[in-house]
């Protein structure tokens, strides 16, 4: 499948150049709408008991995964049947839309810009668009840390993991991954509403991100060495703090980022009005500053490029073997 490899490379390039233009309807919105619709229906069908909500959550995962993989696979098959060029163009389009490299940079740089303008309310609003925590009372340091943390975490589940699944199975597998990831972001909360209903989605997200998160961490360590950051500290903090999170995956790249930047990340945060106790990640060698958002993005970009080279190289090796 030489076209799949070419589509991955071209799509990655388009993502870096164009990001997510507003004139293009993003397929992930369709997935999000489907999840919301199915949740509403399943909550009516299954009893409002812990076991009933668990069962409803399992059915949500099954239905969304079937649609997330099956619909793109059928559309791609039909496109190639009509004409190989149409199939290739659709594959390129989806390989462009599935990763979120430039989008992550653009959204986090909005936070940076507001901080440089000394507009703390604006920075709080900008960071609220990319994090799940409450941001209304965050200090400048809190806003900066939140932005750096989301760049670090999304380097794995927004960039490297999508590239990995695209390389393994093309857009259909990429959309399957994004479906699981989107379910987790919508229903994978440990609050009263989603504790049982969202459990299956959250656990599945942990499973599918287990390997990508660790690949992302080591790629980021390599990228920090290429960027002449403190890669030895990045490796040290990674080995020490990579499990300092409720999720087995979220602290993997956060630990590398904290070590490379020589700052302390994570710690307590407020979600839905309640303080959630979290361990810190990294050592407080120096205070976090707005410029760390730019540094984090440089590291994220280089990590994404190394990921593309690594995954495309492996695919090419087996393709031409």
Q: Model-derived features: where do they sit?
A:
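Hydrophobic alpha-helical transmembrane segments
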Residues: 1-176, 180, 188-321
């Amino acid at each position: 499948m030489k076209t799949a490899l070419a589509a991955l490379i071209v799509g990655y390039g388009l993502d870096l150049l164009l990001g997510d233009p507003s004139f293009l309807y993003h397929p992930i919105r369709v997935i999000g709408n489907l999840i919301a619709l199915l949740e509403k229906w399943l909550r009516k069908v299954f009893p409002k008991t812990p076991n009933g909500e668990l069962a409803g959550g399992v059915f949500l995962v099954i239905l969304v995964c079937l649609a997330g993989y099956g619909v793109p696979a059928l559309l791609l098959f039909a496109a190639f049947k009509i004409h190989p060029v149409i199939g290739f163009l659709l594959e390129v389009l989806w390989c462009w839309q599935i990763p979120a490299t430039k989008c992550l940079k653009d959204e986090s740089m909005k936070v940076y810009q507001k901080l440089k303008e000394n507009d703390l309310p604006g920075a709080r609003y900008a960071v609220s668009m990319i994090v799940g925590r409450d941001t209304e009372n965050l200090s400048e340091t809190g806003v900066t840390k939140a932005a750096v943390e989301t760049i670090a975490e999304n380097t794995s589940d927004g960039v490297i993991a999508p590239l990995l699944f695209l390389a393994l199975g093309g857009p259909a597998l990429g959309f399957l991954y994004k479906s699981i990831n989107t379910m987790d972001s919508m229903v994978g909360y440990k609050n009263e509403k989603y504790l049982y209903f969202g459990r299956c989605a959250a656990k599945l997200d942990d499973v599918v991100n287990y390997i990508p998160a660790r690949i992302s961490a080591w790629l980021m360590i390599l990228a920090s060495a290429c960027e002449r950051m403190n890669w030895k500290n990045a490796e040290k903090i990674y080995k020490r703090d990579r499990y300092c999170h409720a999720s087995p995956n979220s602290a993997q790249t956060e630990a590398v980022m904290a070590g490379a930047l020589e700052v302390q990340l994570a710690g307590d945060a407020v979600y839905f009005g309640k303080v959630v106790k979290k361990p810190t990640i990294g050592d407080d060698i120096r205070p976090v500053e707005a410029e760390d958002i730019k540094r984090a993005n440089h590291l994220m970009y280089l990590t994404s490029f190394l990921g593309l080279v690594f995954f495309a190289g492996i695919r090419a090796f087996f393709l031409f073997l």
